[in-house]
Amino acid sequence: MAELLMDGIEKKYDGGSFAIKNFDLQIKDKEFVVFVGPSGCGKSTVLRMIAGLEKATAGSIYIDGKVLDKKMAANGDIAMVFQNYALYPHMSVYDNIAYSMKIKKVPKRQIKENVEKVADMLGLKEVLKRKPGQLSGGQKQRVAIGKALIRTPKVFLMDEPLSNLDAKLRTQMRMEIKELYKHSDATFVYVTHDQTEAMTLGTKIVVLNNGKIQQASTPKELYNKPANLFVAQFIGTPQMNVWKAKVVQEKKNVMLFIGGLGRYRLSEKNAELLRKRGYFDKEVYVGIRPEDIFLQVKGMDDEMFQSSLAARLKVYELDGAVSYLHLETAGESDSIENEKISSNENVAKNWNDTIESENKFNSNVTIRIEGNGDFREGEEYHFGFDESKIHFFDIETEKAIR
């Protein structure tokens, strides 16, 4: 059993800057938790504090209810795999893996059995006599994992272990780490800046930014229900489309006026959500993932077409079975939607001007579609949203509106 609890953790450096602040997190026994975030967000600092390599300025870390101390790491309860492998270059693969057991003066026979078992698990039996300089990057990483694995730790820490590998090897090693986790009784804590690694490996993902937890959830929850604007845009490739918009009542309909793109009629459910939360006649951020946008053809549904958005295709990318359409604002003078706004013409025009001058997000659009089609760069396309997948965020707090 290895349950971790981080209670009020802070890490403050001599200059007065905080690497970690107000950090509270529970990691359950046998979970695979991934810390992910941009460079400098504090994820590796948290891992090093769990490993005992750095001391928290405030707060405590507990493992199975006991305050973390140096003895836990020394006894082998915690093992860490580093980004740069941390192998002894003058030792063979066998001796690198066996090193911790030799230090403890474990009988040679038991060492041999354990090393061979780990080597077999990691596909290293054929290279046990080689030295690190004779190994590929993937083999070096397996040896580093073997060094940690042979200690049978309660907590397995990994600090960006795949960042030095090429794309093919990273994919292969992800699968191997996942298999290792399935057959292990340890709790895994993994650090990466790569969201693909995070989404494919973790049972729980902790998104960090500026030393604070933005959201800690399952991969599915994180993707479908981001807690704030940062998480929404950090998770997902290509990233979520986000625009500033104004919520306006137009006769019986509730419209979004999106600067540069036009107006969009909301479903009753989304309109009611914004009404209840008090966002009528206010600004919001609107987010939609590229795969949740669909193209509209005139005549399919004329009423829906009238309230669709429009932009010109700037770049068309075909990526095997998937296509990406990158569209940009058509420009106010020749935008179809701006010509059709009637009862709120002045509101829309003023809103377009305001958005274009101060919007921290541009009005460009990325759409992901299955397959390919006859798309022409420079032409204008109409599109709508899967309304069950629209996300709204508060302008001031950037928190999700739910």
Q: Would you name each region that the model predicts?
A:
Residues T57-S60, Q110, N210, I390:
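Conserved coupling/switch loops of ABC nucleotide-binding domains, chiefly the family-specific signature
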Residues E250-R402:
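Non-catalytic connector elements of ABC transporters
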Residues G59-V67:
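Conserved ABC transporter NBD signature motif
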